[in-house]
Amino acid sequence: MIDEFKTISDTVGEGYYTEKRSKFLAFAHHVTTVDEVKEIVAGYRKKYYDARHCCYAYMLGPERTEFRANDDGEPSSTAGKPILGQITKAELTDILIVVIRYFGGVKLGTSGLIVAYREAAIDALAHCEEVTQQVEEIVTYDFTYPMMNDVMRIVKEMNPHIVDQTFDNTCTIKLSIRKSEAEQLRTRLKKLSFE
């Protein structure tokens, strides 16, 4: 079970690489959805409308199962895959790297393109702050008011984040806790119901 994952902070990491007068501008973003990816890529296409290519790669989710590499007109697997390769090598997720290419008039060839896009991605990652995030799970528990002290004792001991709580005839508490500890929290709370 994946309990934590590596990603980057919300600060955009910028990279730059030149090869035979072609300029490669790279930008690394923290993202969590495909819609965010589309919005950011569209923004770069609009901002750098005069650039020849806007290639990108992304990886999403703690399990790192959702990913895509886009060559945007470059020869197959010469742009998106090298960018994705750097994301994979760094074991990052919830990340998008966009590389903008301004053509310098000299063709780089397949290997030259692979190196250029890879190096631009490496430079963008070098200017990012890497962070480790926990995979959280929400646990909701309903209990009667007389059980309050016991519930709060468990909350204090296990230290989950209290997302929401309502205290009435029937009380409800909504907790966010590290995924690996969620089952233990559920078990301890359920035991209170039978005491």
Where do the PLM segments sit?
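Terminal, non-globular segments
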Residues: 175, 181-184
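Ordered, amphipathic secondary-structure segments that act as subunit-interaction surfaces
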Residues: 67, 74-108
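Interdomain boundary/hinge elements
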Residues: 54-56, 130-139, 165-169
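A common structural junction motif
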Residues: 48-51, 158-163, 190-195
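Short cationic amphipathic helices and targeting signals
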Residues: 26-30, 137-143, 170-177
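Glycine- and Gly-Pro-enriched alpha-helical subdomains that act as flexible
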Residues: 96-99, 106-150, 154-155
